[in-house]
Regions:
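N-terminal beta-strand motif that seeds the catalytic metal site of vicinal oxygen chelate
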Residues: 1-17, 70-73, 122-138
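Core segments of cupin and vicinal oxygen chelate
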Residues: 2, 7-50
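Vicinal oxygen chelate
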Residues: 2-12, 30, 40-41, 45, 62-138, ...
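Short glycine/serine/proline-enriched coil/turn segments at secondary-structure junctions
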Residues: 34-36, 63-65, 103
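Generic beta-structure capping elements
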Residues: 45, 55-58, 124
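Active-site/binding-pocket entry motifs
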Residues: 48, 61-62, 127
């Protein structure tokens, strides 16, 4: 088994697509259904051909409520400072660069999408493997 994608509802598909395009995601496919539901499949360049994020616009499902059960998605970047500058230049408002594990740990920043979903941007320190491993918790 492996994780395929993260999917969540959005209130305005065009607004969300514009936001995620600025972050670096690209459209892989789109499916439209009766009743006005649209599913937009996205990924980042390093994801190759695989969809990693699905935005679901379902106007018939009632008001969008994130609630307190969803925390965030995390996106790995090569250079967090450059990424933050690029996002700001595109009109987005990323959070400050943080060092949650001290100067030898990852650099992180939080970003909110138009619906309030949180995205954690992570730059690993030199020599760290891509992704989170058991060693990160020891």
């Amino acid at each position: 088994m492996k994780t395929l994608l993260t999917a969540y509802r959005v209130a305005d598909l065009d607004r969300s697509f514009d936001f995620y395009t600025k972050v670096g995601f690209r459209e892989i496919g789109r499916a439209e259904f009766e009743g006005g539901t649209t599913r937009l499949m996205l990924n980042l360049p390093a994801d190759g051909e695989f969809v990693t994020l699905e935005l679901v616009h379902d106007p018939g499902a009632g008001p969008l409520e994130i609630g307190n059960g969803f925390s965030h998605i995390a996106v790995q970047v090569d250079d967090l400072a450059a990424t933050l500058a690029d996002l700001a230049a595109k009109g987005l408002a990323p959070g400050q660069l943080e060092l949650p594990a001290g100067e030898h740990g990852p650099k992180t920043s939080m970003l909110l999408d138009p619906d309030g979903y949180r995205i954690e941007l992570v730059e690993w320190p030199p020599g760290h493997p891509d992704g989170i491993t058991r060693a990160d918790f020891e």
